Regions:
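Glycine- (often His-adjacent) and acidic-residue-rich active-site loop
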Residues: 13-16, 94-98
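Crotonase-fold acyl-CoA enzyme core
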Residues: 1-84, 111, 115-116, 120-124, ...
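Short beta-strand->loop
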Residues: 98-102, 136
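A short structural micro-motif
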Residues: 93-94, 129-133
Length: 138
């Protein structure tokens, strides 16, 4: 999030109750009490407050936002695709599943990842004390 920006729900200012899952997402991000306060007051939340509440992961100076976003995208795109896919699945599963289900899913994913060329490359790179170079065709 750019350091000079803010967010607001603003629905209370226009006589609407909210849309696009605002209540669902905010409640899960910051808890029901804070979500309700933001919805009822329509107050502006600064970038720093968003960071403190856990709504965003980082604050970046405005001039650097585009470059930071591009670098983050490249870092992810250059990662081990199969492992990254399973990481996303694991996190998504964890939202609504019990621990046993999550552990089972993680174990299956780990076994799949352990058979990939990316894992083999990562082990070689670790032993050779160098960063891994994953096979990510474009």
């Amino acid at each position: 999030m750019a350091d000079d920006t803010f967010i607001t729900t603003a629905f209370a200012n226009i006589g609407l109750s909210g849309d696009y899952g605002t209540s669902w997402f905010l409640t899960r991000l910051i808890g029901p009490s804070r979500a309700l306060e933001l919805m009822l007051t329509a107050s502006r939340i600064t970038a720093k407050e968003c960071l403190d509440l856990g709504i965003v992961n980082t604050i970046t100076p405005y001039e650097e936002v585009r470059n930071r976003a591009r670098q983050l995208a490249l870092d992810i795109a250059n990662g081990p695709r199969t492992a990254l896919r399973y990481m996303k699945e694991n996190i998504n599963r964890a939202v609504n599943s019990d621990l046993k289900t999550c552990l089972s899913g993680e174990a299956r994913a780990l076994m799949q990842c352990s058979r990939t060329d990316d894992h083999k490359e990562a082990v070689r790179a670790f032993m050779e004390k160098r960063p891994p170079i994953f096979n990510n065709p474009r």
